[in-house]
Amino acid sequence: MLLGPRVRFAPSPTGYFHVGSARSALFNWLLARQSPEGCFILRIEDTDADRNREEWVDGIISAMAWLGLDLDEGPFRQSDNHERHLAATASLVAAGYLYYCDCTSDEVAARKGDNKTPGYDGFCRTRALSQSPTTALRFATPREGVTVVPDLIRGDVEFQNTTIDDFVVAKSSGAVLYALANVADDRHDRITHVIRGEEHLPNAPKQMMLWRALNEVSGDEVPLPVYAHLPLLVNEQRKKLSKRKDPVATESYRDQGYLASAFVNYLALLGWSPRGDEEIVPLSTLIEQFRLEDVSHSPAFFDVKKLSHLNGEYLRALSSEEFVDACAPWVAPQTTSWRPTDREVPWSDADFDPELFRRVAPLVHERVATLGEVPGMVAFFFLDELVFDEAAFDKVLRGDPLGQAMLAAAAERFAETSWDAASLHAATVELGEAMGMNLRKAQAPIRCAVTGSLVGPPLFESLEHLGRERVLARLRSALTRCSA
């Protein structure tokens, strides 16, 4: 007797791990974790040999581990269940549920003529063909009645059987297709809930027909699962997320420095809301409150700006030490077991000072939305050769004699000022007042000369951590650069 929900996440390894797939995996996992007897299964549906790649399999498993979606069973590969699929096919053929068809797509189209009704016309249904190298297998769909899909999100969804054509379940090569392979594996695994994207809703009545047929021919009355078809994820234009145009790869968000906890929190809010108005929802609360019946059937906007805001909140909730540790793959990847893909740190190991980073990390902790932003904000601490924002340099130094005068005065005053943020701030205020400049304008040429940019962490604390010698050298170098 099954005591808890048995759910499976069954992705096809044909590309990067889509954020929609990540949400489906999460919702399955949340349901399983609500019961001590719940079971979360990963089954890789890899029967499409022409499109599957092993690197995509690895990507799925790696991304799920990053998200913390631990497995109770699996990962299994659907291709390992080939004998099970063949046995299911043979039993359905013997019972008359399947028939052989040798029609080509051109022949089907020619018979239709001007009739634009989609689907197969059932031409081979009564021809009693035998298996051959040119015959596929089709399911003989009932010609009458209604198939009702019980959906926890959408209610009962009715499909007139006349609108469901005799669909192919096995190719002429003998390869068993998704519809039958999926049902055979779900029955074997005693799946109780099928939670997936709404694009799979048209498959549900076909799979229910196959499920009932297999129950009959096997004598094993496995209960049909309950379905839950999740709403589409849409972009800012409220169109379905495009794999080509929209940032949909889960791996890319990990590489950009989003925290797994923030990403999971955000995924959970795509179509579902917890009780209350809080955006930050602990995982324990997600598990406790999640109900498929509360998921909306309306499209959910995948808002990267909102995700970034939420991630920033999660980052700011980290302690200083936790933040430093979290930054390690982006600032010192050689010291970690994982590093972001195709993201090179802009300094060498020899230039990186872990202790200096520990001291300056609080300066950027409150200012970044992702960990991937950290290297750009602290690079000037570790690079001997600054990378200048040339437009900024032209604006406040090369093209501004007053900015150059301020820089020369700062180089002279900073040589004797007490080396702490407060003293450096006071000295800059005094120099600016003498030149008729407010603090914002007075510090701009100093910031650009020392950091290469007009934006970044607090200036005077940064100067303190850089040290007098490096700051004075950069001020003088910038003055020389102005006349170059």
Model-derived segments and spans:
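N-terminal Rossmann-like or analogous alpha/beta NTP/dinucleotide-binding catalytic cores
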Residues: 1-118, 203-222, 262
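Glycine- and acidic
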Residues: 7-13, 42-46, 189-195, 427-429, ...
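Conserved phosphate-binding loops in nucleotide/dinucleotide-binding enzymes
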Residues: 78, 171-172, 189-200, 234-266, ...
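Active-site cores that bind ATP or allylic diphosphates and position pyrophosphate for catalysis
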Residues: 100-241, 249, 274
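Short alpha-helical scaffolding segments that buttress acidic/His motifs in well-ordered protein cores
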Residues: 267, 311, 361-368, 381, ...
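Active-site-proximal acidic segments at structured loop/helix or strand boundaries
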Residues: 274-333, 338, 346-358, 362
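Small-residue-rich helix-loop
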Residues: 320, 324-435
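Charged substrate- and nucleic-acid-binding regions of tRNA-handling and nucleotidyl-transfer enzymes
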Residues: 418, 422-482
